[in-house]
């Protein structure tokens, strides 16, 4: 096919596409056969298509005609006679036999009689009387009253209430003194056992909580520069004492702080005991701190 034929083919395709777009309402009409003629013309044109450009136009035309054919198919009433509104209106008028009287009163009465006769005829086509569903809304309406339930305040028996522990300045001072006391005690133990395996030093095989506390107290020695971790030839961290730096050394930047985080989990705690075969704790087990209250009565 020559280039001129291709241009002509594309032109005919575009004309068909424009015709389909402009005549959508006419093409879906039941009495109109132009849609069939359009599809037939498109089939004839498709026999000359041999390039992607023309094939694209054919696909676009096919899509539009298929959409219109689907709409037209839904409008078809196969096996049903076509309902003619004009003929139906004409028959209604003949049945009613509209009055020709010039008197308004007489004319209104005759119209009412005619419509009553039509209503009786229509009632013969109904199998059941009209139900309430055809009416708008219920016959009666009762406003629902809102049921508001008041919640009563929960009253607890006085004998089961306990007074919370009241912390005052004296209690806080005592806790601070205990922390300082334990840090000094651990510092003396370190001086007596240094250099010592760091994990062996802080681990208490009889108490996991006190192992965590020992790690907490040793961190104060690191912070004050009184202890340091040194790796030995076997790669084990050894804990030993240090002389705290002076203020001049800190200001001059001669001291470099390295912050480490040790997550002492229960699994790690048990593995340390098993790995180093720890039987006794270097740091003695401390007595538990008991908290007592002066009264079991709630005041509020």
Curated annotation (Swiss-Prot):
Q: What is the top-level taxon of the source organism?
A: Eukaryota
Where's it found, cell-wise?
Nucleus
Has the keyword DNA damage been applied to this entry? yes
What Pfam families does the record point to?
Answer: Nse4_C
- InterPro entries assigned to the protein according to its UniProt record, in alphabetical order: Nse4/EID, Nse4_C
Annotated GO biological process: DNA repair; double-strand break repair via homologous recombination; meiotic cell cycle
Which residue ranges run through the membrane?
Answer: none
Q: Which UniProt keywords apply?
A: DNA damage, DNA recombination, DNA repair, Meiosis, Nucleus
Subunit relationships: Two subcomplexes smc5-smc6-nse2 and nse1-nse3-nse4 exist. These subcomplexes are then brought together via a number of interactions, forming the Smc5-Smc6 complex.
Query: Which family is it part of?
Result: Belongs to the NSE4 family.
Job description of the protein = Acts in a DNA repair pathway for removal of UV-induced DNA damage that is distinct from classical nucleotide excision repair and in repair of ionizing radiation damage. Functions in homologous recombination repair of DNA double strand breaks and in recovery of stalled replication forks. Plays a critical role in meiosis.
Query: Can you say what this protein is called?
Result: Non-structural maintenance of chromosome element 4
State the organism named in the record: Schizosaccharomyces pombe (strain 972 / ATCC 24843) (Fission yeast)
């Amino acid at each position: 096919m020559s280039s001129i034929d291709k241009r002509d083919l594309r032109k005919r395709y575009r004309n068909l596409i424009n015709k389909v777009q402009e005549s959508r309402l006419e093409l879906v009409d039941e009495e109109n056969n132009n849609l069939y003629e359009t599809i037939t013309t498109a089939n004839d044109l498709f026999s000359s298509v041999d390039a992607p450009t023309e094939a694209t136009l054919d696909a676009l035309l096919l899509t539009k005609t298929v959409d219109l054919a689907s709409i037209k198919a839904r409008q078809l009433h196969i096996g049903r006679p076509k309902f003619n509104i004009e003929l139906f209106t004409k028959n209604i008028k003949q049945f009613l036999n509209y009055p020709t009287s010039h008197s308004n009163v007489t004319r209104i009465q005759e119209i009412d009689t005619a419509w009553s006769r039509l209503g009786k005829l229509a009632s013969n086509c109904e199998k059941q009387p009209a139900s309430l569903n055809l009416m708008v809304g219920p016959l009666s309406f009762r406003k629902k009253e809102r049921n508001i339930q008041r919640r009563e305040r929960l009253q607890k028996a006085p004998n089961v209430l306990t007074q919370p522990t009241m912390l005052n300045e004296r209690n806080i001072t005592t806790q601070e003194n205990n922390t300082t006391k334990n840090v000094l005690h651990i510092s003396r133990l370190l001086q007596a056992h240094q250099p010592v395996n760091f994990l062996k030093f802080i681990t208490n095989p009889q108490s996991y909580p006190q192992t965590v506390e020992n790690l907490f107290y040793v961190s104060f020695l690191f912070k004050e520069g009184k202890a340091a971790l040194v790796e030995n030839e076997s790669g084990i961290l050894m804990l030993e004492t240090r002389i705290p730096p002076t203020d001049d050394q800190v200001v001059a930047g001669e001291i470099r702080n390295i912050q480490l985080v040790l997550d002492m989990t229960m699994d790690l705690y048990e593995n340390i005991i098993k790995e180093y075969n720890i039987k006794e704790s270097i740091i003695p087990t401390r007595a538990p701190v008991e908290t007592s209250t002066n009264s079991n009565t709630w005041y509020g």
